[in-house]
């Protein structure tokens, strides 16, 4: 966000960049140390640093970049886990500001959905004229790709965040087979049945007590042979990698987010 990699495109000292950008020199010095250790920066002679190979750099503005994941981890995951001791002592929880972090979370979801896209596309093959609903469509990158690939099908996306919904509208404005609506899931009233409903990275916003009600509700929105596709992280057991436990702990740290489902629960 500070375009620091651009500031280090030529060999330059930390103090010079700190002065030019009017930022804290001590923190910038620590930032450069991390950059060197992970290969984003090169340490040059006379205490100068230079940006490393461009392909290695996180690029937050590109949906295919790891930069969006790093941004979410720095803004949300790491601070939440570091706050665990205080929360346990005070018996409190953080509050997830959905509007503040909506854009970051939407970008991360869009990056991860690239992995699921081929599987979803298989559900649409063989029947080009389908009606598809994407719940929590984010910035619309997902249904944009599907709409371009299946022009005879109609795609509707609903998104609770007003700013994210507007981004989705802009991204899909050129596609006649896509419509975006700013709406809460529980307030949405479909006008017709859907052949395919997509629900990606939404489960943790729904309390465990209301998940069965949600699935019952969605089943009424499906056509006779309709399909509900759910993409979500799942909570692991004691034998799962440490990252899985840490990831699930993140959701437990917020009063308005909920634990990930177990595979058996799904």
Put a short name on every predicted segment:
Residues 1-77:
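N-terminal accessory segments
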Residues 128-138:
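Conserved class I S-adenosyl-L-methionine
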Residues 139-151:
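Conserved SAM-binding loop of SAM-dependent methyltransferases across substrates and taxa
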Residues 161:
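Conserved SAM/SAH-binding beta-strand->alpha-helix loop
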Residues 168-169:
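Conserved SAM-binding loop
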Residues 212-224:
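A short glycine-rich, Lys/Arg-flanked "PGG" loop and its adjoining helix->strand segment in the class I
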Residues 225-233:
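Conserved beta-strand signature within the Rossmann-like core of class I S-adenosyl-L-methionine
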Residues 241-262:
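Conserved Class I S-adenosyl-L-methionine
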């Amino acid at each position: 966000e500070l375009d620091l990699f651009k500031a280090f495109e030529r060999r330059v000292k930390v103090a010079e960049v700190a002065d030019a950008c009017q930022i804290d020199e001590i923190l910038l010095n620590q930032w450069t140390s991390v950059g060197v250790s992970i290969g984003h920066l090169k340490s040059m002679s006379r205490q100068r640093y230079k940006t490393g190979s461009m392909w290695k750099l996180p690029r937050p503005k590109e949906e295919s970049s790891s930069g969006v994941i790093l941004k979410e981890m720095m803004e949300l995951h790491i601070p939440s886990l570091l706050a665990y001791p205080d929360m346990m002592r005070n018996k409190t929880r953080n509050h997830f500001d959905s509007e503040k972090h909506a854009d970051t979370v939407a970008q991360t979801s869009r990056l991860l959905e690239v992995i699921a896209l081929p599987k979803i596309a298989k559900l649409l093959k063989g029947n080009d004229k389908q009606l598809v609903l994407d719940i929590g469509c984010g910035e619309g990158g997902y249904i944009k790709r599907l709409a371009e690939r299946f022009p005879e099908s109609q795609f509707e996306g609903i998104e609770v965040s007003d700013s994210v919904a507007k981004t989705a509208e802009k991204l899909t404005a050129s596609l006649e087979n896509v419509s975006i609506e700013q709406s809460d899931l529980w307030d949405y009233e479909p006008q017709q049945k859907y052949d395919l409903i997509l629900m990606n990275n939404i489960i943790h916003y729904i309390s465990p007590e209301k998940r069965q009600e949600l699935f019952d509700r969605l089943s009424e929105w499906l056509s006779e042979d309709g399909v509900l596709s759910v993409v979500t992280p799942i909570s692991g057991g004691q034998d799962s990698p440490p990252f899985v436990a840490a990831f699930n702990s993140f959701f437990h740290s917020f009063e308005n987010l909920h634990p990930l489902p177990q595979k058996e629960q799904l």
